[in-house]
């Protein structure tokens, strides 16, 4: 849908990814074992302030940092007080602006505030894909002839910079 094409970034929970898809031909079994939950794709608008709130919440959890799409970068310092840990939050190299509205994609578990990520429930212009699951999106990505290279996977987009 055009709604997905206009998405600026995507966020998912670490616990929603349960395996790695091995190199080579991608099988349906590999996709299902990696993304086993029936989470639908959801798009919504969030302000930069709401995005920062989500990232702060993740930085306060022992294993709950959100996994982010290409172009989004977050650095946080786990030695700082909760709520003040995010030190860098950029999209395509530009700082996330509190007042700017960003069109994001996530899964239905997070969209409903799962894992305590409450700011997702404040999202505007919400659109649930109605039976179109995260696993469907992964399959469609590969069916369209897209690949994932080692180069694309290099570098941490989310990193703890604690000294």
Predicted regions and their residues:
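Feature captures C-terminal
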Residues: 3-163
């Amino acid at each position: 849908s055009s709604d997905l094409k206009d998405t600026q970034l995507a966020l998912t929970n670490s616990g929603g990814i349960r395996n790695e898809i091995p190199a080579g031909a991608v099988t349906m079994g590999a996709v299902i074992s990696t993304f086993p939950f029936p989470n639908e794709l959801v798009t919504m608008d969030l302000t930069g302030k709401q995005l920062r709130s989500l990232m702060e919440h993740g930085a306060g959890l022992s294993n709950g940092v959100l996994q982010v799409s290409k172009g989004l970068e977050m650095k946080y310092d786990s030695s700082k007080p909760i709520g003040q840990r995010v030190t860098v939050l950029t999209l395509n190299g530009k700082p996330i602006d509190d007042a700017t509205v960003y069109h994001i994609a996530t899964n239905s578990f997070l969209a409903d505030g799962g894992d305590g990520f409450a700011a997702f429930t404040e999202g505007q212009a919400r659109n649930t894909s109605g039976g179109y699951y995260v696993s469907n999106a992964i399959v469609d990505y590969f069916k369209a002839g897209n690949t994932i290279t080692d180069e694309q996977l290099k570098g941490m987009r989310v990193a703890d910079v604690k000294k």
